[in-house]
Structure formats: C-alpha cells, structure tokens
Amino acid sequence: MGKKRIYELAKEINVSSKQIIAKAEEKGFPVKNHMSTLGENEERQLRAAFKPQAKTSHEQSAASAQPQRKVQQPRREKSQGTARTQTTAQKPAGKPANQTQRNNNNKNNGQTGNRQHEQQHSGTGRFGGSLNNNTNNSNGRRNSNNSNSRGGRNSRNNRNNRRRNNNNNNRYKKNQRIKDTNQHKGAPERKNKALPEVLVYTDGMNAQDLAKILHRSSAEIVKKLFMLGVMVNQNQSLDKDTIEILADDYGIQAQEKVEVDVTDIDKFFDAEMANKDFEAPRAPVVTIMGHVDHGKTTLLDHLRHSHITDGEAGGITQAIGAYQVHYNDKVITFLDTPGHAAFTEMRARGAEITDITVLVVAADDGVMPQTIEAIHHAKAAGTPIIVAVNKIDKPGANPNHVMEQLTEYELIPEDWGGDTIFVEISAKFGKNIDELLDMILLQSDVLELKANPKQNGVGSVIEARLDQGKGSVATLLVQQGTLHVGDPIVVGNTFGRVRTMVNERGRRIKDATPSTPVEITGLNDVPEAGDRFVVFDDEKTARAAGEERAKEALVKERRNTSHVTLDNLFDSLKEGEMKEVDVIIKADVQGSVEALAGSLKKIDVSGVRVNIIHSAVGAINESDVTLAEASDAIIIGFNVRPTPQARAQADSDKVDIRLHNVIYNAIDEIETAMKGLLEPTYEEEIIGEVEVKDIFHASKVGTIVGGMVTEGYVTSESDVRLIRDGVVIYEGKLGSLKRFKDDVKQVKMGYELGLTIENYNDVKVGDVIEAYVMKEVPVK
C-alpha cells in the first residue's frame, strides 16, 4: 500500500492535523505540513499516541449528546404545570374587576388589561418556569389602556420568538447529529477498498479510467498526480510513463494491456496449429490427382463403396469431394478434385491441407499433359507422391513404360533404387486397392501426423456454394482442434454460428475431430475455396472479426498479390526474399525446351539458382498461368505465344510472361535481371506537329521560328524532329518556346508560337517540326 498523508490520518482518528504535526515533531519525525507522508512505523506510533485521546473525544461527544435529549423532558413537565397555573390564575381575576368598579370610566379597559396580564403571566410561567403573585398584582393595578395593550402584544411576540428559536435550535441539532452519524458510517467504506495487485492499463487512459480500476476517486488521482509533478485534469489522456509512475506511488505493479487484432485470423490459425499440447495421431489427408479419364473417380468410388460416376455429367467430377475411408481400424481422408485448378487455388491462398498425393496414371495411355501438371503441382506443394498405375487389366497395359516415363520427372520406383512408391491397381475390379491403402498408411506413419483435438477448431474450406434452401453451405476440413455444432466461427471474410454439421454420408454429427471433412450451414455469406476458418469463444467477437474482414475486403477489392517479374527480380533478391527463381518454359519443340532449360540452370548469381518448375511444348495456356500465379514463377515462351485467355488471366493475376525467338536473348535477360542490370525499354510517343509560317533572325539567339501547332501540342521539354519534304533533316531539343513575348511550357493545337531549336538554325518556311517524348515501358 502507499504511504498515508497526515490529513488522511487526522480524519481517520478524528483529531486535527496540527495535533498530529505537533506530536510527530515531538517524536522527531520529518514532517512539514498536512500533506507530508508517514511511513508504516510512524503511522503506527502516532495512532498509539492518539488512541486514548480519540476515545476521550468520543466519550465527550457522546456525553454532550445526552443533555440535548434530556432538555425536551422538562418542557413537557412545564407545559403540564402551566395548565395548572392557568386554572389557578383564574381565581384572582376578580380583584381587577373590583378595582374597575371603583373606576367607572375605565371599566372595560381594566377588564381587558387584567385578561391580558393573565395571558402574559401564564406565558411567563410557561416559558420562564414560575409565576410571581406580587408581579401579577402590580401589573393588574396599571390602569393605562396603551400600556396594557402594548404589554399584551409584546408578550405574544416574545413567546412566539422563543418558540421559533427553540424549534430551529432543535432542528439544527437533530440534522447535525444525523450528518455526523452518516459521515462516521460512510467515510471509511471507500478508503477500505483494496487496491488491485496489478494495474492493467492501455496507453491514453485518463484519470477517470484509472480511478475506476484503482477503486479511488478521480479527484484523488488528479491530486496524487499533482504531488508527483504532473498537472492534468480528469479527462486528459496520460502516457505510459505517467501511469507506471502513478502505479509505483501506490505500491502496485503496472502492466500494459496488449490489444489483439481479431481480424487477423491467420495469426489465430497459426497459434492453434502450433499448439503441441495433447497431441494425438490423426488421419492422413490424401489428394487424388491425374489426367482426365485415368480413373481417379472410379478409384475413390471403389474406396468408399458408392457410385457417383453414373450421376455425373460425362463421367467427369463436377465438384470437390471429401470422403473418409475406414481400413484396418484406421481412417484415411480422400480429396477428389475436378482437375487441378481448385488444388492450385487452395495452395495459392496458403491452405496446405494435403499430406499425401496419389498420382493416378493409366497403364495404357501413359504420362499425359495433365499428369505432368499434377506432378508439378504436388512438388510445388511439397507433398510426397504415391503413383497408382491404373487399368492394368486392359490388354494394352504397360506399367513398365509408365515407370520409364515418370523417371524423367524424378519419380523413380523403389525397385529401381528410388524413393517413390508405385502400386499397380485396377480401380474397376478392385485389384491391389488394399495394397494402395497399406502404402498410404505406411507413408502417413513415416510423416508422424498428429493434431490436438482438445482446443478450438481450425481448418480450411474445401468447397462452398449457395443453396436455395439451406443458404451458404461450406465443406470444411478440420486440421486442428474439434469443431462443434453451435461454435461461433469466422471463415475467410464470412462469419456465423455452426447451425448444422453433416458428414460425407449425409448424416448429422455434433462434432468433427482433426482430418474430418464436414459440410456446415449458418454462414452469412459464401466463402472461397482455400479460405481458413477459426472458432472464437463468443459470437460477438466472431461477428466483429467477420464484419471487419468483409469491410477490408470490400475496400481493397480483393487486391492482387504482386508477383515476381524480371523488373523487380533484383530487388527481391537483394532483400533476401528469394533464394531461387522459379521459371516455367514453353517452347515450340522439345529440343528448344531442353536447350533453354540447360542454359538457365547454369546461371549462378550470388548463390541464387534458377528452378524450372514446369517445361513443355506448346502455346502458353491458362494452366501455365495458374501454376505461375500459385508458385510465384516467371513464364518464358520460346517461339510460342500465349492464348488470348492466358494473356487476359496473366494480366489479371500480374504474372510476368517473357517471349523470345533467340535463345541467347532469353538467357541474357534472365541473367541481367538477376544481376540488377536489366535496363528499361523506352518507346517514342509523338505528341504534336508545328508548321513553320515565318523565319526571324537574331544575332544573339539565331533563327527564330514562327509557326502554328497543327496537331496535338508542344511542350518546352519535348524532343523535336525537323522534317522537310517528308525527310528527317535534324533531331534535337527545343531551345525555347514562346507565345507572343512570354515563355510558356505548352502550346496547344490551333495556337501560334515562337520557338528555337537548340544548336540548329537551318529552318525554312514550310518545314514541319515534329514534337515527341520518350516513355519508359516494361519489357515484354
């Protein structure tokens, strides 16, 4: 607790501050005035010194209060005695009557005077305490009318004044006792409230805010700050140092409250994912990828014992599906993707939800373009690949040829000395499916996949749609924690409360553990595939976070992430953001692809290497742009052009495409960009033309051209080209540009002007002066 001041101690023990100061000086305490502070030992000694005195003063106050209550009792007795006195006082009334009979002229007046004297003496007996007969007789002998009437009025006035004064005194004393009692009872309550052990504050608090936390009045906080040398009012903001000094003066600790940005759900997601407490093994999440019609959906159909192929248009998967398969008392979660766009979009948003990739390759068709793309997608995501060679039941199946083809993409079978698992299957007849599941579980054991189910659920969106009957429907994959029905949730830029939760078989469930795909309802809007979701403790916080994220997204309009280009490549390398440059190569023939790839791999600048993530023959298509956008790569086209759709998508996603027809130019461009030597390209833009109307000669200036702007405009900083009969005679800069006698910066079409060409005078009437500027454009 803080040190107590003298005036505070004086109030508590009910003595004056001067007495405490005098006693403190006797004991040798260093005090100066009533604001001086006392230590605990000094306070204890002074309390002991004034303890008997405080008791005596209390007894005196109690004793002084008793006579005030006894004063009222004699009044009641005297009032009774007054009544008796009035009855006895009626007997001598006849004496004044006899006197008035002897004085016939003053008969009536004498009776009035005697009656008034009776009232006066009765009043005197009532308030004075006793009656005197001699006084009554002497007053009764007065025969003057004026004196008798005046004496009656005075007696009534005196009696009323005394009654009024007594009532006022009694009322004042009663109110004073009530006030003293209330002060005695209410004063210690506020002072006895304990201070908090720690003052949790935020920068910018005022005295009122601190008073509520410290259980003190605002005036006390302002006074204490004043004694500490800080002059503020109760509404003025305080900085961190002042608040900490105040807390130190009170003898408590100060701790600044850390404000958490609830809109940054990625921070909550990472924190939940990093929680290693209560970890337990979880099911692996497996993505099935491959070329169209190679049997991806048929394989998954056999795994989950349902037939979805017949219900889909043309046998092609129309939406992402997530299903769980139970095998050998273990669970495997499978994701079936419609092509690779959704997988890439999820990876582009940072949703690394896949643990293992199963690459399905038909034994009769071999490696196809989408197979190669699937390999590059999986490698870019950093997931291990298990190759399922399908359709081995067909007559033309050649699994060995598939293995030979995949060795070109660094997928070497274990039998051949590599580390890639190959399984020959027949999805149609279910051959070797169990062996494939065994290999998946074996790979998951190697990865040691674990998660904490005893926390709030977090995960990613697999797919989302708007249902007419249900509203927003989202398929979620729980990656950490447990998701319950009724949980307040934020999904991307949407929010809500989990109203219903359905598993892949259409059954309602109440909770979902890690690696479990579920379909939920209750969101206010439709999220996007790859968005993360986080469960909050209360719906109010979830709503605030979701609304703020939606507002930010609306303002920024889903601003595109700036990807690496050759123009900013050197800056990215210099800032240490990149250790390698990802490149996609597309060429007209395979020989050009191999030559360009080999030359680019030999470039070595400051320890940064070129990483070719995809190379193929053919035009640059949308799939190439999607892969480049997800991998932050540069596309190099050799003797090929992008399709219109790919060009539009590249412009939208800010993907850099470089086109060349000379292989060494492509190599030099990449190398110079990595070294920071790539110079900008300039483009000429003609802004105006001037027709020469007249020529003037000045000895100090030279040839002055008088003309008119026939097209565009001319600026004083323009470069000019003198054209005579369609032939360029001279190129240079303007020396000066005037209109009448004033120097101007610009002259527009239809206006006359005067100009000079720097270091050139051979200008003739009828010549055309062309004005142009050089603009910097990025190299494409």
UniProtKB/Swiss-Prot annotation:
Compositionally biased residues, Low complexity: 98-114, 132-158
Transmembrane annotation, as ranges: none
MF terms in GO: GTP binding; GTPase activity; translation initiation factor activity
Bias-annotated ranges (Basic residues): 159-176
Stretch list, region G4: 390-393
UniProt GO cellular component terms: cytosol
Family assignment from sequence similarity: Belongs to the TRAFAC class translation factor GTPase superfamily. Classic translation factor GTPase family. IF-2 subfamily.
Biological role: One of the essential components for the initiation of protein synthesis. Protects formylmethionyl-tRNA from spontaneous hydrolysis and promotes its binding to the 30S ribosomal subunits. Also involved in the hydrolysis of GTP during the formation of the 70S ribosomal complex.
Name of this chain's protein: Translation initiation factor IF-2
Gene label: infB
